[in-house]
Amino acid sequence: MTIRRLPPVLIDRIAAGEVVERPAAAVKELVENAIDAGATEIEVLVVGGGREMIRISDNGSGMSADELSLAVERHATSKLPTEDLLAISTLGFRGEALPSIGAVARLSIASRPKSAPHAFEIRVEGGVVTPPRPAALNGGTRVEVRDLFFATPARLKFLKSDRAEAAAAADVVRRLALARPDVAFTLMTDDRQPLTWVARSMDEAGRAARVADVLGAEAGRNLIPVVGERGGVRLVGLAGLPTYSKANSLSQFLFVNGRPVRDKLLMGALRAAYSDLLPSDRYPVLALFLSLDPREVDVNVHPAKTEVRFRDGGNVRALLVRTLTDALAARVPSTAGTIADRLVELARTPELEPARPAAAIPEFRPYRAEPMPAGGYDWRASPARPLNVAEPDGALEAEMESFAEAVQASFDVGMPAADARADAAVPETGDLDRPLGAARAQLHETYIVAQTREGMVLVDQHAAHERLVYEKLKAALERDGVARQGLLVPAVVDLDPAEADRLAERAGDLAALGLVIEPFGIGAVLVREVPALLAKADVTKLVRDVAEHSAEWDDALPLERRLLHVAATMACHGSVRAGRRLRVEEMNALLREMEETPNAGECNHGRPTFITLSLKDVEKLFARR
């Protein structure tokens, strides 16, 4: 078979396979052209998922008749004034989009510069160009794409449903709208309600407002500002609370010099920054903007221009990880507002239960027939009214009696305190002004109820203490290692032979965390020392859990990350368990320590440690609002 030159139309169709693989790609290229033309208002219409029609209208600089003819030729562009590809400041630069779209669709472009007496329109159908002719247009440019891929029908078989393609196109517009808050956008898809985003300023306040416009008010309430700079690279933006996360990465918006990207290096940095805060299957919501010298980043590495290559990728990664880590650690303890909203919603829309026989439903009488005793009811147990609880053992009896008396004292409103322990049950009024308030009660020996000036806080005692222990282990690692405590009698832990071998290989890593082990025959290890923070933990269960999680370690994972994985497992064993009764002083001490600890709003697995309900939320529960 001899070599031959391909005809221009076929060349354009081949190129279109890289540049325009789906309707969303065409929308991206056309909106980027509008932004590069200086438009401040852009309108996007998508019909039939983009297969039937895509129309982009803008108020940019416009093109003359001669420029229209050049615009539909391959590699003709106004965006490269020189031959330097390392100083690109525009979104587009190759001059491939319009001829590629025209090769596989019916394309029409009407444009009018501000100084021109009227507009001109050019048409391209399947690669065949019709010369420009006069047209009616007030100003700017209008690009209309109909019957996308009619010239390459095989491509249509690979498209998804109209709804899915329209959603992909909308995502493209959202990303570009976030990149340029100073541009007003209107998005229309079929019969859906148009989305309009007004122009904002390009400063941090304008970016935050545009993020709230595009992602919704709920996202705006659950994002915190981040600002950082390192080695000539500046980072600004908004990062989501760990408790406000998604099941996919579609809500992660990254921009480099105003260009939306989905770069592997940047995505890896995000995972590292949130590794202690989110489980592996959850993704933070964020919008981050990197600015650097165009010569320090190569944007010409992917046909769709969605990937970039940094000259100093390590510097960029370090900036992202450090800035996000510091911002998340420095925040006042808080949880996603959506948690309280969902709680209110669930409380006000109870699930339907299967109907029960009428005889099984006791009659509810809100008022008693007999009068209330003058001294009020005695809430304490008596032989006539025994409490339906298990008898405490001797070790806990004194503590439980003290707790019961403290609770009884809190019920005796207006009565003098019986002793000093009753006074301890009522926290200082000043605690109400603290972020997590003053402890008032414990529910099911698992949850702490605290009161604040503005409402109430519900704390998961195990999750909260797990985070506190984990942060202490991390701090000890960063200093001079975790303090150890020797066992009076070394513990022998039986394991699967493979697990025992893995732990033996990691003995050095574990020693840095205070867990000193050594091989003890086949399928067993001998534990000589444990971290001092975990002195009361079940050694056998601790070692078995560490062995189980060690199977998930990747040898390529840095030592620091492996140690933190072990620390997270240890923290779970060293924390207050659900089912343990706490005194009021212990509950308040836990709250105060949470206020001083970084990332106290979520446990090591990404679950919230507490939720806050404002008085307004509580009033909603009782339909008072």
UniProtKB/Swiss-Prot annotation:
Coiled coil where?
none
What InterPro entries does the database record attribute to this sequence?
DNA_mismatch_repair_CS (IPR014762), DNA_mismatch_repair_MutL (IPR020667), DNA_mismatch_S5_2-like (IPR013507), HATPase_C_sf (IPR036890), MutL/Mlh/PMS (IPR002099), MutL/Mlh/Pms-like (IPR038973), MutL_C (IPR014790), MutL_C_dimsub (IPR042120)
Q: Name one GO molecular function term.
A: mismatched DNA binding
Mind telling me which Gene3D superfamilies this protein's record contains? 3.30.230.10, Histidine kinase-like ATPase, C-terminal domain, MutL, C-terminal domain, dimerisation subdomain, MutL, C-terminal domain, regulatory subdomain
Biological-process GO terms, alphabetical = mismatch repair
Swiss-Prot/TrEMBL keywords: DNA damage, DNA repair
**Purpose of the protein:** This protein is involved in the repair of mismatches in DNA. It is required for dam-dependent methyl-directed DNA mismatch repair. May act as a 'molecular matchmaker', a protein that promotes the formation of a stable complex between two or more DNA-binding proteins in an ATP-dependent manner without itself being part of a final effector complex.
Report the protein name in the record. DNA mismatch repair protein MutL
Give the organism's phylogenetic lineage: Bacteria, Pseudomonadati, Pseudomonadota, Alphaproteobacteria, Hyphomicrobiales
